[in-house]
């Protein structure tokens, strides 16, 4: 009886660990060039069509800038914070408007597809060179209260 109990408990634990596995999305964002005010990156976006894949690519760039930072660039540290889920929850209104309202496009200086659309398991992917206006983005984050002004 005791062996059956241990078997059931172990089976339940293994089942729970398998079900709770978190799959983190890959950012696939690579730094190309930049200054203090702008950054250019190459990013892979995925979507059901070319437009959706490009929007996905642009949004990945902002996720990296906000929550991870971009090594080798002027923006090595995350702009907002490293706890993505907590920051998005704390500033839900801002991020909903930023992504769902496509407000992120106001900070994209250029978005140039450099590859054709290719089929992948989750839809279609495209490689895009994206240039972002960092100074305007930083100013917007300060105005919205997500980050503090430098030196104040």
Model region roles, listed by residue range:
Residues 1-9:
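Bacterial N-terminal signal peptides that target proteins for export
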Residues 8-16:
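Bacterial N-terminal signal peptides
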């Amino acid at each position: 009886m005791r062996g059956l109990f241990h078997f059931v408990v172990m089976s339940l634990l293994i089942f729970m660990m398998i079900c709770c596995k978190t799959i983190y999305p890959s950012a696939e964002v690579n730094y190309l060039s930049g200054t203090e005010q702008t950054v250019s990156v190459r990013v892979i976006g995925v979507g059901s069509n070319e437009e959706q894949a490009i929007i996905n690519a642009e949004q990945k760039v902002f996720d990296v800038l906000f929550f991870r930072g971009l090594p080798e660039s002027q923006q090595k540290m995350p702009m907002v914070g490293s706890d993505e889920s907590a920051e998005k929850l704390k500033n839900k209104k801002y991020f909903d408007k930023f992504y769902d309202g496509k407000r992120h496009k106001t900070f994209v200086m250029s978005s140039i597809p450099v590859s054709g659309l290719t089929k992948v398991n989750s839809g279609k992917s495209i490689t895009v060179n994206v240039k972002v206006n960092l100074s305007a983005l930083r100013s917007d984050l300060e105005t919205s209260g997500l980050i503090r002004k430098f030196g104040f």
